[in-house]
C-alpha cells in the first residue's frame, strides 16, 4: 500500500511540473511573436477550452482502461508536446499545440485524481489533500528550477526538454499504481447528467478554482497598482498564496480526519473570505500579501476535498461525477480571471475580489456536500 501511495504522490508531482512549464512558456511566446494582450488572451483560451472539452471523454477512458494506463498515455504525450510548445514556429501552430496540450493535461488531471481517489479508498484514510500538496510542491520545485536554468542562460526549449525527461523518469514507477480505478460503465451508458450533489460540488469547485485563477492573474496587479508596491515586490502576493496553499494541503488530511471534511471546508471558505477582506479593506501592500497568503491557506484544501467527495457521489458512477466536478472547476479557473477583469474595469479590482469572496461564502454553505 505504501508503494501505491508514494507513486500516487509522484504522479501528482509530475502533473505540477506539467502545468508550471506551460505557464512559464507563455511570456516567452508573447515576446517571440510580439503578441498583444488581447491576442495572447485568445491564445490562452485554447488551452483551457481543450482541457474542459476533453474531461467527459477522459472519465469514460478511465472507466474503460483504468487510470494507470490513462496516466501513462497522457504523461507520455505531455513529454512529446512540451518540446513542441517550446519550439513552435508561429502563433497559429502554438495555439493549436496549446489546445492539444490543454486537452491532454485535462485528461491527465482526471486520471491522476481518479487514481488518488481509488488509492485513498483502498487505504481507508484521507490522502487527497496530501496528493494535491505534492502537486503544489511540483509547481514550486519546477518554478525554482526553471528560474535557475533560465538565469544561467538556458533556453525555454531546453527547459521543456529537461522537464519532459524528468516526467519520463517518473513514469518508470507507473507500474506501481492501481491498474483499474473506477467502475466500468454499463453497456451503452457513456454520458450522465450531473445530479444535484454533483452540481453542488462542481459549483463549490468553481469558486475554489476561480480564487486560484484570480490570485494567479490579478494579485500582483492589485498590489502594484492599488497598493503602490514595486513590481518585483508585488509578485509576493502570488508567492504567499502558492506557498500557503501547499502548506495547507500538507496538513489537510490530518485536519479533515480530526475535525471532519465539512468543517475543514467551512473553515477554508471562511479564511478565504477573511483573506480577501484583509487585502481589499486595509490600504497596505504588506497586509495585502498576508491577505493573499490567508486566501491560499484557506482555499488550499477545498479542491482536494471536493474531488474526493466527487468519487463518492451516491447514485452516480465515479467516471461521470469526477470529470463533471473537475470540468466545472476548470471553468472557474478559465472564466474567473476574465470575470474579475470585467468587474474591475467598471468598479475597481477591490470590488472584483469581493465577487470572488461572495462565491467562497456560498461554498461555505455547500460544505455539507463533502461529507
Residue ranges and their predicted role:
Residues 24-38, 217-233:
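Short amphipathic helix-loop junctions that connect adjacent transmembrane helices
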Residues 34, 66, 87-92, 228, ...:
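Helix-breaking motifs and short loop linkers at transmembrane-helix boundaries and internal kinks
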Residues 53-92:
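Conserved MFS/SLC helix-loop-helix module at the cytosolic interface between two early adjacent transmembrane helices
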Residues 54-67, 150, 248-260, 344:
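Helix-to-loop junctions at the C-terminal end of transmembrane segments
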Residues 69-83, 263-278:
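Structural signature of the two symmetry-related core transmembrane helices
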Residues 106-122, 301-314:
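Intracellular juxtamembrane helix-capping segments at the cytosolic ends
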Residues 130-178:
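Helix-loop-helix hairpin linking two adjacent transmembrane segments in secondary transporters
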Residues 157-174, 351-369:
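Symmetry-related core transmembrane helices of the 12-TM Major Facilitator Superfamily/SLC fold
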